[in-house]
Curated annotation (Swiss-Prot):
Native species: Anaeromyxobacter dehalogenans (strain 2CP-C)
Membrane topology category: Multi-pass membrane protein
The protein's name: Undecaprenyl-diphosphatase
Keyword tags: Antibiotic resistance, Cell inner membrane, Cell membrane, Cell shape, Cell wall biogenesis/degradation, Hydrolase, Membrane, Peptidoglycan synthesis, Transmembrane, Transmembrane helix
Encoding gene per record: uppP
Subcellular location: Cell inner membrane
Length: 292
């Protein structure tokens, strides 16, 4: 893989991990167009590892929030009042919201990886329509501070649904938050914070299992480093842009994007460019993924 291609893959990962449009679907199409097959263990490792860049972007962007939540949760636990402050409650609610995806990922991983590209196309369109409904019907009034245990669990279930390729972790969780009445920005902010535990755990597992595939592959290793750095830097910028966008604008552009992408993948399958079978990249850590 050339360094230019690696940088482009990193950019695609960053853009589509955090926007509610599915990084899995876009990496699939982009890989096919550039002639990279996921039967190649090196390319599969590359796709997996560059997702660590977007995880790093979340950690850096929300470092102050994460530090505050961890400190408050730990302090409350030590003092025997784990839910004593808003920050402590939010920290524990994020862990609560992580459970559905963790359980679903453990139980359904092999079945999910067997899903084909028609599922990706259908997920893109289907969730696009649900996002449209959320945009039109939701109240958009609640803030992150208003998150309760029920909200965290329901948005966590939405995060688990992102294990289905083409759904988008950020897409399902932002949509879930909006349907519960949160503002667009609050839904996105909670979505990103919720991604931290699951993407760290799933990312560490996937890195451990795929890094050996690049052993002795100097060119691929360099390309992977480039792609990961690009995905981290671009991912940071995308997070900042998306939060600013959602403060004053709607998600309609992403509804159109999802439906168009789903239709494009369906057309590529029908034309024989993409196989109908399960040759998509593994979904981002639910992440997975946010992915973003």
């Amino acid at each position: 893989m050339s360094l230019v291609s690696a940088a482009l893959f990193g950019l695609v990962q960053a853009l589509t991990e955090f926007l509610p449009v599915s990084s899995t679907a876009h990496l699939l199409v982009f890989g096919e167009l550039l002639g990279h097959s996921l039967d190649d263990r090196r390319f599969r490792a590359f796709v997996t590892i560059i997702q660590a860049g977007t995880t790093l972007a979340v950690l850096i962007y929300f470092r102050a929030d994460i530090a505050r939540l961890v400190a408050a949760s730990t302090r409350g636990l030590v003092r025997g009042k784990p839910l004593g402050t808003p920050e402590a409650r939010l920290g524990w609610y994020i862990l609560l919201g992580t459970l559905p995806a963790a359980l679903a990922g453990k139980l359904l991983e092999r079945r999910i990886e067997a899903l084909g590209n028609w599922v990706i196309a259908g997920s893109l369109v289907g969730l696009g329509l649900v996002l449209l409904a959320a945009e039109r019907l939701a109240s958009h009034r609640r803030r992150v501070e208003d998150v309760g245990p029920g909200d965290a669990l329901l948005i966590g279930v939405a995060q688990a649904l992102a294990l289905v390729p083409g759904s988008s972790r950020s897409g399902t969780t932002i949509t879930g938050g909006m349907l519960l009445g949160f503002t667009r920005e609050a839904a996105a902010r909670f979505s990103f914070l919720l991604s931290v535990p699951i993407t760290l755990a799933a990312g560490a597992y996937k890195l451990w299992s795929t890094v050996p595939d690049l052993r002795g592959e100097v060119a691929w290793t360099v390309a992977t480093v480039v792609g990961t750095v690009v995905s981290a830097v671009a991912g940071y910028l995308v997070i900042d842009w998306l939060l600013a966008w959602l403060r004053t604008r709607t998600t309609y552009v992403f509804v159109v994007w999802r439906i168009a992408a789903g239709a494009a993948i369906a057309a590529l399958i029908l034309s024989g460019v993409l196989p109908a079978g399960a040759e998509a990249p593994p979904p981002p850590p639910p992440a997975l993924h946010a992915a973003p």
